[in-house]
């Protein structure tokens, strides 16, 4: 028996279908799809429970696709049998069709990490799953997996990503299990090899920043930061406008940006560095990545004599690592010297001040002391720089 349902949400049509579609009920299927209004903004057809579709059913689907014209049209959750039909007939080449997720269970699996978006479970000796929290947007999950794959293809050393699966009612992405420790862990375990580990840190950052792309599906890091300015709290309208002015003045670029090149996101396997957490892969000028390291190890560092809970080491050790990293990356000790060889270095500190505002002046993660630090950087450093660079506000 064929069952269909139609829901219109914010002008978008969501259709679910169940059963088999053949010549006997194709007309019924067509009548159900004909109920989709002409003024919809797009269509998603969920066929998770469709067991079979004949050529008559395919023509009904094709007719709906033609009615949509250039509007978004997606078919999702096709079973392997139905997906085979779409691929054999060429429909998979003219429509956006996604197969159903493989289902697994994480019952009894070890939790090896938790983050803002979800949890990581060890599936077996070779694979892990990053299982997103239940409210995660499926499009975000697909986007993050796509970025991880693109990073690997472009030559960025990163974990191999497999498929999107469903586990215990939640969606996740299966990745290669990298049997190694992070660069941060190695530094904490053997301080005598600090220079060697910092050299590895420099090398992996240079490798990422040497890769360029014009792939339109990889987002602009600059534009992502611009969009986030609206979420900053506790500043005046003028200060917010200066944040917009600053980011608009930053040069565009086609360099690959990881977005969070800290030593906890770099695994070392068989002497080679491998990056994890590719969700912010973007393009922009290299100073974006380097400024985030500066922000994290200098402006977000604990006070002298205190313990840095993020890096799990004394604040003085974090400072030492950054100073060695800077010297290794630029071949000198100061930004003024580095700028003589690379004019883009003039953006290093301003972008770090900007990052302080974008991180510390949002949400409740940072305490009042850090919010005060960020406001000081905004008012005493970033705004004066922006006024010099762009001119005073009219």
Give the label of every model feature segment.
Residues 21-95:
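Amphipathic alpha-helical interaction surfaces in cytosolic regulatory modules
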Residues 210-259, 263, 269, 386, ...:
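An alpha-helical support segment within catalytic cores of ATP-dependent transferases
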Residues 1-16:
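Short beta-strand/loop segment at the start of cytosolic alpha/beta domains
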Residues 199, 309-394:
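Helix-rich C-terminal or lid/interface subdomains of diverse kinases
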Residues 112, 119-123, 243-288:
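Active-site acidic catalytic loop and adjacent metal/ATP-binding pocket
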Residues 110-111, 116-216, 251:
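ATP-binding pocket architecture of kinase catalytic cores
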């Amino acid at each position: 028996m064929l069952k269909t349902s139609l829901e219109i949400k914010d002008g978008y049509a969501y259709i679910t279908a169940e059963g088999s579609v053949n010549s006997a009920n194709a007309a019924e299927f067509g009548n159900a799809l004909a109920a989709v209004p002409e003024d919809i903004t797009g269509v998603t057809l969920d066929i998770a429970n469709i067991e079979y579709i004949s050529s008559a059913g395919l023509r009904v689907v094709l007719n709906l696709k033609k009615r949509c014209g250039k509007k978004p049209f997606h078919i999702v959750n096709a079973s392997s049998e139905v997906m085979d039909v779409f691929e054999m007939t060429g429909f998979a080449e003219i429509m956006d069709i996604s197969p159903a997720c493989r289902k697994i269970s994480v019952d009894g699996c070890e939790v090896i990490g938790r983050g803002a978006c979800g949890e990581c479970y060890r599936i077996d000796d070779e694979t892990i799953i990053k299982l997103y929290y239940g409210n995660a947007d499926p499009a975000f999950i697909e986007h993050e997996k796509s970025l991880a794959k693109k990073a690997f293809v472009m030559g960025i050393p990163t974990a191999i990503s497999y498929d999107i699966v469903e586990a215990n009612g939640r969606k996740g992405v299966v990745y290669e299990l990298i049997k190694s420790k992070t660069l941060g862990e190695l530094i904490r375990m053997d301080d005598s090899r600090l220079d060697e580990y910092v050299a590895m840190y420099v090398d992996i950052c240079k490798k990422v920043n040497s890769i360029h792309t014009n792939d339109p599906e990889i987002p602009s890091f600059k534009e992502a930061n611009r969009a986030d300015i609206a979420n900053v709290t506790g500043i005046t309208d003028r200060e917010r406008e200066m944040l917009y002015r600053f980011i608009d003045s930053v040069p565009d670029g086609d360099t690959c940006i990881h977005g969070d090149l800290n030593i906890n996101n770099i695994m070392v396997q068989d002497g080679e560095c491998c990056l994890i957490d590719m969700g912010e892969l973007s393009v922009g000028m290299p100073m974006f990545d380097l400024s985030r390291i500066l922000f994290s190890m200098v402006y977000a560092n604990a006070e002298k004599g205190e313990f840095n809970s993020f890096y799990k080491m004394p604040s003085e050790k974090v400072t030492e690592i950054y100073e060695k990293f800077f010297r290794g990356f630029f071949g000198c000790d100061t930004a003024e010297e580095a700028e003589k060889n690379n004019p883009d270095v003039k953006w290093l500190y301003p972008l770090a001040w900007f990052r302080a505002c974008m991180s510390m002046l949002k949400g409740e993660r940072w305490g009042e002391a850090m919010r005060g630090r960020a406001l000081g950087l905004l008012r005493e450093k970033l705004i004066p720089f922006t006024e010099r660079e762009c001119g005073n506000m009219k």
